[in-house]
Amino acid sequence: DLEDFSFSPTYLAFYDKLEKANLFLENILHFADQDLTDRETYTLLGSPLPDGGQWDMAISLIKKYGVVPSWVMPETVHSTGTAKYLPILNRKLREDALELRAMAKEGKDTAARREEMLAEIYNALCILYGQPPRSFDFEYTDKDEHYHCDRNLTPHTFLEKYVGNDLDDYVVIISSPIHALNRTYCQPFMGDVVEENMFWLNLSQEELEDLTIRQLQAGEGV
């Protein structure tokens, strides 16, 4: 019933960066026995905190953190352009990675130090994006000029009440002829949330085109 509404990309971008930092440190510890020049570790250190993502990554964030209206956590100078600060955070994460690798090789417990590192990333993101809200009042005027106020919503309760939980009804489809068709593939060590994985269903180009047309005809974007 709203004439104009948008979700906050800044809110999800904040947690996207935080979760990617956590996944980076998780992967660094997983490959702690490797040399720095080994393929996996070298690739990880090349881009600790990448921009962008895919459907599965967005859904993982939404399921874990919920969503908020754009005015609850608006854009900032840094949320609209990451080029100036990402090199700084990437350098910090590389330094953290070297420290955790050294601790792991010495047989030390890395959990507490890793939490401290993530807390530092969190604080930096708060400076860049603002601190994410724990709750908010959803105030709006509908098309009939009637005022509404839904108080003390959390990002999760807002998601459940106004968006729904059917996001898992969607799957990511690709068409890669160099891989077996009609199979689901998983890409390890990628994504944002450690607890989630990225999956793709590989179909023929003809099936991909047919499903695209049918989804558009059903009134849903692709």
Task: Label the model's feature ranges.
Residues 2-222:
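Catalytic-core signature of thiol
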